[in-house]
C-alpha cells in the first residue's frame, strides 16, 4: 500500500495557444503558499511547457515534470495515459504530501478528454481570439469539462468577438456547469477558478 498522500489531480486541456501554460503559471503562483503543488506537462517532441513554467518560477524545478508523448497528445491523456500516470505517481512518492497535481495536456481539439484514471477534475481552456463561435461548436471539452475557461477577453475588440454572445452560447451549451471569462495578464477571473478548485476538489476540508 502506498504511504504517500493521494493528491487531487486536475487535468488542464485546450487548443494550442489558448493559454493553458499561462493559466498554470498563474494558478501555481497564487496557490503555492497555501497548498503543496506539482505539475506534469505534455508536449509531443519537446519539454517546452516544462521549461516555460520553470523559467517563470511557477514552482521549484523539481516539482515540474515534462512528458514527451511522441505522438497524438489526446492518446497520452485518454486511451494510454501510462506515461502521465507514472509521472503523477513519481511526484506523489517524491514529495509525499502533495495537495494538488496539475496535468497539462498537449494542444487539443474540442473532442479531447482526460481519462478518469488520470484526472479527478478537468479544466478546459479556449480563447476569445478563436472567435465568438467557439462555445457553440460544442465538443466534450466545452460541454463536459468540470470548468471552462474563456481566456484573453482583452482581445475581444480586436477580433470582433462579442463577449455577450460567447456568454450566452456557453450557458446554453454547458447548462449549470461552471465557467469564467479570464484575462490572465491582469488576473481577471483567476479567483473564480481557485474557488472552484478549493470547493469541488475539497482542498479546504
From Swiss-Prot:
Classification via Pfam families: cobW (PF02492)
Alphabetical list of HAMAP family matching this protein: UreG
Statement: the UniProt record of this protein carries the keyword Cytoplasm: yes
CC annotations in GO: cytoplasm
Protein name as annotated: Urease accessory protein UreG
CDD domains: UreG
Annotated S-S bridges: none
Compartments it resides in: Cytoplasm
Function per UniProt: Facilitates the functional incorporation of the urease nickel metallocenter. This process requires GTP hydrolysis, probably effectuated by UreG.
GO MF annotations in UniProt: GTP binding; GTPase activity; nickel cation binding
Residues bound to GTP: 14-21
Stored InterPro entries: CobW/HypB/UreG_nucleotide-bd (IPR003495), P-loop_NTPase (IPR027417), UreG (IPR004400)
Assigned protein family: Belongs to the SIMIBI class G3E GTPase family. UreG subfamily.
Oligomer status and interactors: Homodimer. UreD, UreF and UreG form a complex that acts as a GTP-hydrolysis-dependent molecular chaperone, activating the urease apoprotein by helping to assemble the nickel containing metallocenter of UreC. The UreE protein probably delivers the nickel.
Biological-process GO terms, alphabetical: urea catabolic process
Organism: Citrobacter koseri (strain ATCC BAA-895 / CDC 4225-83 / SGSC4696)
Keyword annotations of the record: Chaperone, Cytoplasm, GTP-binding, Nickel insertion, Nucleotide-binding
Amino acid at each position: 500500500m502506498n504511504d504517500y498522500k493521494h493528491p487531487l489531480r486536475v487535468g488542464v486541456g485546450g487548443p494550442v495557444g489558448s493559454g493553458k501554460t499561462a493559466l498554470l503559471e498563474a494558478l501555481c503562483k497564487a496557490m503555492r503558499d497555501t497548498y503543496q503543488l506539482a505539475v506534469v506537462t505534455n508536449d509531443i517532441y519537446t519539454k517546452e511547457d516544462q521549461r516555460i513554467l520553470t523559467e517563470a518560477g511557477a514552482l521549484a524545478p523539481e516539482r515540474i515534470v515534462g512528458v514527451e508523448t511522441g505522438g497524438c497528445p489526446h492518446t497520452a491523456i485518454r486511451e494510454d495515459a501510462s506515461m502521465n500516470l507514472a509521472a503523477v505517481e513519481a511526484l506523489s512518492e517524491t514529495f509525499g504530501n502533495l495537495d494538488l497535481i496539475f496535468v497539462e495536456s498537449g494542444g487539443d481539439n474540442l473532442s479531447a478528454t482526460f481519462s478518469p484514471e488520470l484526472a479527478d477534475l478537468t479544466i478546459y481552456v479556449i480563447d476569445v481570439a478563436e472567435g465568438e463561435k467557439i462555445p457553440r461548436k460544442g465538443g466534450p471539452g466545452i460541454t463536459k469539462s468540470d470548468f471552462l475557461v474563456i481566456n484573453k477577453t482583452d482581445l475581444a475588440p480586436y477580433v470582433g468577438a462579442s463577449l455577450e454572445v460567447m456568454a450566452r452560447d456557453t450557458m446554453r451549451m454547458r447548462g449549470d456547469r461552471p465557467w469564467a471569462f479570464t484575462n490572465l495578464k491582469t488576473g481577471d477571473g483567476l479567483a473564480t477558478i481557485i474557488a472552484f478548485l478549493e470547493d469541488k476538489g475539497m482542498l479546504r476540508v
